[in-house]
A protein has these predicted regions:
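A short pre-motif secondary-structure segment
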Residues: 97-101
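Short, small-hydrophobic-rich alpha-helical interface motif
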Residues: 2, 6, 16-27, 47, ...
């Protein structure tokens, strides 16, 4: 689940794996106290989302023009689905909510608890995210 969450913000599976490893390392080294399993799960999801956003921001700062990039041999990765690519193209506040709702099966109330947001805010982000997703997918078809 955490890997899928990291993948919604990152285009590289290796970066997503690194993020999840860093989150578990932080869990082991800081040893935070949790009230129950739900609290621990919420902490893991929130920390994964924050770390993935940090990595995505850092990647944007160190991007290299395509002409200057060196081509390295490697394994071919399967193309992500057009819908997943569109979800990843959304701003973080929308993609996180959409991913948790549709891919992880959380309710709006559960997402609000996980992200520490008011329930109406989550509903609004879900609605606006769907609309932006429609626009992105419509542009891809045209």
């Amino acid at each position: 689940m955490l890997l899928r969450i990291a993948m919604t913000r990152l285009s590289s599976p290796a970066d997503a794996e690194d993020v999840v490893q860093e989150v578990f390392l932080k869990l082991l080294t800081t040893r935070p106290h949790f009230r129950d399993l739900e609290h621990e799960k919420a902490w893991l999801i929130r920390t994964t989302l924050h770390r993935a956003c940090d990595v995505a921001r850092a990647a944007e700062r160190r991007t290299l023009p395509l002409e200057d990039a060196e081509v390295l041999p490697g394994r071919e990765l399967p193309e992500p689905s057009p819908i997943l690519s569109a979800v990843q193209a959304l701003p973080a506040k929308y993609s996180a909510v959409i991913h948790l709702y549709y891919y992880e099966g959380y309710s709006i109330k559960e997402i609000a608890n996980l992200l520490r947001l008011p329930v109406p805010t989550v509903g609004t982000r879900l609605s606006r995210g769907r609309e932006r997703l429609r626009q992105i997918l419509k542009e891809d078809v045209e």
